[in-house]
A protein has these predicted regions:
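Surface-exposed coil/turn segments at beta-strand junctions on protein surfaces, enriched
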Residues: 29, 41-43, 75-77, 91-93, ...
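Transmembrane beta-strands of outer-membrane beta-barrel proteins
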Residues: 34-36, 48-50, 84, 98-102, ...
Length: 143
């Protein structure tokens, strides 16, 4: 877990609109963020893992679009993105191993709730986890 503060020495202009106030915080840099990884291997051929990423609130630019009439600096919500994987190994020949695995990415389905829409949307107004909750299965063959 990391706590840091990214500030400009002097408030910075970020919009071409002179009515938009400058900001002293750097955009897209949360003050608090971190990750964790846990792995459990009860037997040599079976494993489970749990990973996660936390991103605290941050300031992002939301430029003039179909949703907002002027450029604004938006404070995002925090996000927690967790992933789970389970794997089982099988020896199919003396030097060949087959692994079957599966899991869930973005376990809690964390995502941005306020996307812009329409032809005049701000395509740069994207933050938070990129993938929705996803279930996957895999096969790995190793020598």
């Amino acid at each position: 877990l990391t706590y840091q503060k990214s500030l400009y020495k002097e408030p910075a202009e970020w919009s071409e609109n002179p009515d938009v106030a400058p900001v002293d915080r750097m955009f897209r840099t949360p003050d608090l963020y971190g990750y964790f990884t846990m792995q459990y291997t009860p037997t040599k051929k079976f494993s489970m893992s749990l990973t996660g990423t936390y991103s605290g609130p941050m300031l992002v630019q939301h430029m003039e679009s179909s949703v907002t009439p002027v450029d604004i600096a938006v404070e995002t919500p925090s996000f927690f993105d967790a992933n789970f994987k389970i794997a089982k190994d099988f020896s199919i020949f003396p030097m060949v191993n087959l692994q079957l695995n599966g899991g869930v990415m973005n376990l809690f389905n964390s995502f941005q709730k306020d996307f812009d829409t329409g032809a005049d949307r701000d395509s740069g107004y994207i933050y938070g986890p990129m993938m929705p909750r996803s279930i996957y299965f895999g096969v790995k063959l190793s020598l």
